[in-house]
């Protein structure tokens, strides 16, 4: 199983026989964490039949954690999960399971197709996920914008973050309406000074420059 099964054997099995084996199957989530209720019910049925019934959505690497299987039931559980279209994730010194935000499917902040990038990258490295052969773990995470909902900066070795590459888009009528209500102090303190790249400046109308590359 490579890195996808975390074996756990108890040192007190002679005293507590039911604790003798409690293995975990790490299963890769779909890009964007999209599930329908039919799939979730089937997952629950599989784990009730072959495991303890305890499932964690999701581990810190993004895996669905099917916790509590015996050695004899690991293969049966994997086969049933695999029939649903899911594959084991990674553990140890390998390429780990990845995560991507809901992104282009539902979020207006999305700057690229996160689900497509997630799938293509992970499919490319699937052999390195299943067969640990690296000196240390390696994680990809995909966030569609600098809000970084996947915490890729903190949690990944390769953070893929969508950014805006164009002029700032403004609604002049809305901006004037907002300014009339909030005034100069809020404009400076809550808008201009909060731009990390200092892309916004306040100019007198007579000193404005007009150019195709200036919003």
Model-found features: residue ranges?
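N-terminal basic/disordered segments at the start of proteins
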Residues: 1-39
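Short, non-ligating residues that shape and space the ligands of small metal-coordination modules
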Residues: 201-202
